[in-house]
Every structure is written in structure tokens, then in C-alpha cells.
A protein has these predicted regions:
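Glycine-biased, small-residue-rich flexible motifs in mid-sequence functional cores and linkers
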Residues: 2-6, 82-377
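Short, small/acidic-rich helices and loops at N termini and domain boundaries
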Residues: 1-86, 260, 360-369, 373-376
Length: 377
């Protein structure tokens, strides 16, 4: 069964167990001389290693049939890359704890080809209308060089993937569970979205081997891969305990760019993003901020354009129309306090609507923080 296996094959066996990180596999190799010797060693020879892990490893090894697992992957068109492979995405390879193996469907080469334009877009699973609109406007303002990475969960993740596809951008999804036969471990409602990502030339990737259980502890591991694949991470909306905060933390630990969208101080879904901004994270209120933060020159076709006034209500609803009318009465320039008083709207609604209007190029702010109405309106 183990005849004619290369050192790469034995690396695959160890990585497939999901018991050892890349650093630990390296230590095992150094201790035994080769991974083949480690695999064939008796349990007594493993005394230098943690007993509970050794017990799990020998239980795994007893039931592991390499040819069966490789055939399963091949039959279901599930590909894999090892950390020691040349094609392994370099952005991911350069984080503190890169996964020793990744399983994927689709075109994983995008992760390398578009690494300088790779952007993680993450946020709350229970996204607000504000969060969804902001994600939509921001992604619509990016050109086709960008690769959008997210986690295929509900809320902002779903919005990020859909808007990328709608705007002709490639997108990749990172799962918190395994790839299985015709089943993708994501919300059932996103099954066809996952298929669409692959059909449109994107990819779905995970570090969890087939048949493994989906556990709560999987998701922080997934979040580190989302951040690790990308040059920058944008948090659109996040509550106090949102996993998106952890993704931002992983990105910062990897010396990647971290950005956040300002939100209402009254919104539970903006506690995380507003805290990130307090911690000197770059604020994003329009696509041009993403280009600036990532050091990418904006394509002429994506420079902010003023939207037709007929679309204002569609973009920002009745509140948007009220704010525009207020600014017209105030000679197209006003403080936020003046707008609130004039519109008879509460503060959170004014702030959230202004952000949408800014993203749409309908209003802007000057150095004093005053709101300016577009000259074309």
C-alpha cells in the first residue's frame, strides 16, 4: 500500500490528518530524518511528542487508505496543493501559520495571478440594509483587476461574492468545512452561488479534508486563510463579537492592509468596525479609498461618477431625497447638524444615508467636514 511513495506523498498523508500544522510537520521530519520514517515508526518512537496527538495520529493512520482518499478527490474533481508545492499561493504561504494543505475547486491560480489586487470583503452574517448597500457600491467601484475573497456565509460574505460576479470580477470563497461529493459546506441557500463562483472562473478553497466535521473552531482557521490570501482586508460591518474582527486581526498580524467602513454609533452591527477605526484602521467611504490604501492607481473607467438624480431615491430612498432637498435649500453646502435639523430625521439615519450618497458620488465632504452637493445637481 505504501510502495513507491515520495516524500511529497508522505507530506500529504500527514497534512491530510489535520492533526499537524506546517511547523509541526517540519519538526517531525527533522526528528525522524524523513516523513517516510516518521510514518513507518512505531508508537514508542514518538515519545518526544504530545501523547494525545500521537494517539489520534495512530488512530488516523490505522484507518487511512491513501489510494482510496486520492481516488475520492480525483473522482470529485477536488484538487489540492501542499505548502511545499511551487504553485501554493505566495500570499498565504507568508502568514505565520499557513495550512500545510489546501483543497480546492476551480481556478486557484487566480490567488497568485491577482495577488496584488486581492481584497477580502467581510462582515456580519446578519447584515443591515446599510451594510449590503455599502458593499454593493464599493465593489461596483472596483475594476476587473480585483479578486474578491470572502467566506460564502450569510450577510456581507454573500453580498461580496454576488456583487463581484455581477460586476465581472473574479471571486474566491474560503470554507469553514470540507469539500464533499456535490456538497459544499456552506449555507444551503448559497449552494448555487458556490456553483456560479466556479462557473465564472473563480475558486472555492478549504484546509479541511473531506469527511471532516464542521466545528465552531473551524471558523477562526478559515478567517486566517481569508486574510492570508489577500493584500488587503475590508470590514464592511461587524458587531462586537463578529468573526470579521478576527479576520482583520489576522490581516494585521500578517502585515496586510486593514480597512473598515464607518457606521452609526447607535448600530450594534457597527461596534466592531468603529472600534477598528479607533485603533487606527484606514477608513473607507468610497472605492477610491480602497485604491489609495492598497497603493493601486484607479482606472479611468472607475473614477467616481455623479449619478443621475432620477436614481437618488433608488440609491438612498426617501431619506436621500430629503437630504438632497435640504442641501439645495442650504446652497449645496451644510454641516451635518443643519441637515438633521432641516430634514427632521434622526442622527443615525442621516449618517447612514450620507455614507450611501458619498459612495454614489452624489455628495462629498470638505476639509471642515461639511457636506457638499455635487455641482451637477
Amino acid at each position: 500500500m505504501l510502495k513507491n511513495n515520495s516524500e511529497r506523498d508522505f507530506y500529504f498523508f500527514f497534512a491530510y490528518s489535520d492533526l499537524f500544522g506546517a511547523e509541526k510537520i517540519s519538526l517531525i521530519k527533522n526528528f525522524f530524518g524523513t516523513l517516510e520514517k516518521a510514518w513507518l515508526a512505531e508508537k514508542i518512537e514518538w515519545q518526544e511528542f504530545k501523547n494525545s496527538t500521537v494517539e489520534k495520529f495512530f488512530k488516523f493512520k490505522k484507518n487511512f487508505l491513501p489510494e482510496r482518499e486520492k481516488n475520492y478527490l480525483q473522482e470529485n474533481k477536488i484538487n489540492y496543493l501542499l505548502l511545499i508545492d511551487e504553485d501554493y499561493p505566495s500570499n498565504l504561504k507568508n502568514i505565520s501559520y499557513p495550512p500545510p494543505i489546501i483543497f480546492y475547486l476551480g481556478n486557484i491560480k487566480l490567488a497568485e495571478e491577482q495577488k496584488e489586487y486581492s481584497l477580502a470583503v467581510v462582515g456580519s452574517r446578519i447584515a443591515s440594509a446599510y451594510g449590503r448597500q455599502v458593499a454593493k457600491e464599493l465593489i461596483a467601484g472596483l475594476d476587473k483587476r480585483f479578486l474578491i475573497i470572502s467566506g460564502l456565509a450569510f450577510g456581507i460574505d454573500t453580498c461580496a461574492h454576488r456583487e463581484a460576479l455581477a460586476n465581472g470580477l473574479k471571486t474566491g470563497a474560503v470554507l469553514g468545512g470540507p469539500l464533499e461529493k456535490d456538497i459544499i459546506s456552506c449555507p444551503a441557500e448559497n449552494y448555487w452561488l458556490a456553483k456560479k463562483i466556479i462557473a465564472d472562473g473563480g475558486f472555492i478553497v478549504t484546509e479541511f479534508p473531506p469527511h471532516s466535521l464542521i466545528q465552531k473552531s473551524n471558523f477562526p482557521r478559515r478567517n486566517r486563510i481569508i486574510a492570508g490570501l489577500c493584500l488587503g482586508t475590508l470590514v464592511v460591518e461587524a458587531g462586537r463579537k463578529s468573526g470579521a474582527n478576527k479576520t482583520a486581526e489576522y490581516a494585521r498580524d500578517a502585515n496586510r492592509v486593514v480597512m473598515a467602513v464607518p457606521g452609526s454609533i447607535y448600530s450594534e452591527l457597527s461596534i466592531g468596525t468603529n472600534k477598528l477605526l479607533k485603533d487606527h484602521t484606514d477608513a473607507v467611504s468610497g472605492p477610491e479609498d480602497i485604491y489609495r490604501c492598497l497603493g493601486i492607481k484607479m482606472a479611468n473607467s472607475k473614477k467616481p461618477k455623479i449619478k443621475n438624480t432620477e436614481n437618488i431615491e433608488k440609491i438612498a430612498g426617501e431619506d436621500g431625497l430629503k437630504i438632497i432637498k435640504s442641501l439645495l435649500l442650504l446652497n449645496k453646502i451644510a454641516n451635518i447638524e443643519e441637515i438633521i435639523e432641516n430634514c427632521q430625521l434622526d442622527t443615525p439615519r442621516v449618517h447612514s444615508t450620507l455614507t450611501i450618497l458619498e459612495l454614489s458620488g452624489i455628495v462629498s465632504r470638505n476639509g471642515s467636514g461639511q457636506i457638499l452637493l455635487s455641482k451637477n445637481l
